Amino acid sequence: MSEAEARPSNFIRQIIDEDLASGKHTSVHTRFPPEPNGYLHIGHAKSICLNFGIAEDYQGQCNLRFDDTNPVKEDVEFVESIKRDVEWLGFTWSGDVRYSSDYFDQLYQYAVELINKGLAYVDELTPEQMREYRGTLTAPGKNSPYRDRSVEENLALFEKMRAGGFAEGTACLRAKIDMASPFIVMRDPVLYRIKFAEHHQSGNKWCIYPMYDFTHCISDALEGITHSLCTLEFQDNRRLYDWVLDNISIDCHPRQYEFSRLNLEYTIMSKRKLNQLVTEKVVEGWDDPRMPTISGLRRRGYTAASIREFCRRIGVTKQDNNVEMMSLESCIRDDLNEHAPRAMAVLDPIKVVIENRAAGEEWLTMPNHPNNPEMGSRQVPFDSEIYIDRADFREEANKQYKRLVLGKEVRLRNAYVIKAERVEKDAEGNVTTLYCSYDAETLNKDPADGRKVKGVIHWVSVAHALPAEIRLYDRLFNVPNPAAAEDFLSTINPESLVIRQGFVEPSLADAVSDKTYQFEREGYFCADSRYSRPGALVFNRTVGLRDTWAAKATQ
């Protein structure tokens, strides 16, 4: 299959193919323009993969441009986080990082040009009056009493705005288009507003800041963007995008195309609601492993490759649709099943004493991956005292239970066959210690007498086990569409985080956060980037071995 044939086909790529074939464009230039007022989430990853992926596939360019036109909400912290996320996903932007604030001087001159053409005016309606004058979807708006000011007066007032002569909220620059337009975005939209706030790039040079719709199209044009890709909520804004570029002296006129945003079940994408989760301490922070932020997914153990594959699988369309969480989880399972080294961890330990074995360690060679010899092997200690998981033992059980039962045998992973002989209990009747015998001739082989041992369980040596905090992360919400609830916080899954104190094998002593392991029979886990350190290990569950929510949904 050729590289072109391997590309995911969608309507945007078809448009690009047609533009290149017709000679409308000789190259492709896209951009990813986030506002630095928060952390990127999985929905942004879709846009990143689309814009950077197109540039890569067509040997074009993709700019990283920060839409930094609101100094009140923006911060360098978010700038650095976004740059880190884009790079972590595996993409490189063309040239230097760009900022809309780089173009503030030019944007101001284009605003003056619109005033000189009689296409913009300084309005002094209050925000409340402006909303009243705007009209509704079924009723036209009405003209501001300041709409017919002369060019000279508007130029003077706009300069006064720039000089700080108006208080915030008392004046703004508006485009003069059509207050009766059926599209509210075209009813004399605001182009500039006043904000007395220090900007993270330009400092205190400006006290007036351009609006997104004015800035976005001009920035695209100044950078020579060929295909400006936005989500569907900006579809009506395309009319204003074109109006601005049609009415200023600029050579390049990019075309905007819209695609559906990502709606992922069991999560929310609203920046306001995500911020509420953080500020109300429902989650630990923006990088909480339950959050849909890229930093949260990274801390949870998701790989960049799995997120890119997810974006490839869901595709790009114009139709809004809900994507099942299992689609994302399937991508990380597929990736980790192939690439994650194996290790053993006991999350709910019960002590096992092997009575017919002398104390003393024996080092067993275990493969790091059962299907990939190239991943090598590791040495794991075995001794006469081990931990197994409490769920792997029953005093009585039916034939469907394939683990350890009193009086019966089970195989220890990559080790020996053991038989449960007797138990020791506490005053409440809980098993505290399990006494077993082992067959010394069954190391990685069947019993010599031909008896069948069906079950296999994992274990760790008591003398060598490393204590670890195991954080069992799950979906943050317990309904598919939490945003539809009257109070989305009422749909929080109370079991989205369960903490266990367990033990892991010694090979994990130096586990690092950017490496995810399969804890055999438990799931995929990574060391927590914030808290885990040698001697105080903390592991986050990335995803279980199988989807347990599908079964819940049918109950």
From Swiss-Prot:
Keywords: Aminoacyl-tRNA synthetase, ATP-binding, Cytoplasm, Ligase, Nucleotide-binding, Protein biosynthesis. CDD domains: GlnRS_core (cd00807). A motif ('KMSKS' region) lies at residues 268-272. It catalyses: tRNA(Gln) + L-glutamine + ATP = L-glutaminyl-tRNA(Gln) + AMP + diphosphate. InterPro entries: aa-tRNA-synth_I_CS, Gln-tRNA-synth, Gln/Glu-tRNA_Ligase, Gln_tRNA_ligase_bac, Glu/Gln-tRNA-synth, Glu/Gln-tRNA-synth_Ib_cat-dom, Glu/Gln-tRNA-synth_Ib_codon-bd, Glu_tRNA_lig_a-bdl. The keyword Cytoplasm applies. ATP binds at residues 35-37, 41-47, 231, 261-262, 269-271. It is found in: Cytoplasm. One of its GO terms (cellular component) is cytosol. It comes from the Bacteria. One of its GO terms (molecular function) is ATP binding. L-glutamine binds at residues 67, 212. It is an enzyme of class 6 (ligase). Pfam families: tRNA-synt_1c (PF00749), tRNA-synt_1c_C (PF03950), tRNA-synt_1c_C2 (PF20974). GO terms for biological process: glutaminyl-tRNA aminoacylation; glutamyl-tRNA aminoacylation. Its EC number is 6.1.1.18. A motif ('HIGH' region) lies at residues 34-44. The keyword Chloroplast does not apply. Monomer. Belongs to the class-I aminoacyl-tRNA synthetase family. This is Glutamine--tRNA ligase. It comes from Yersinia pestis. The gene is glnS.
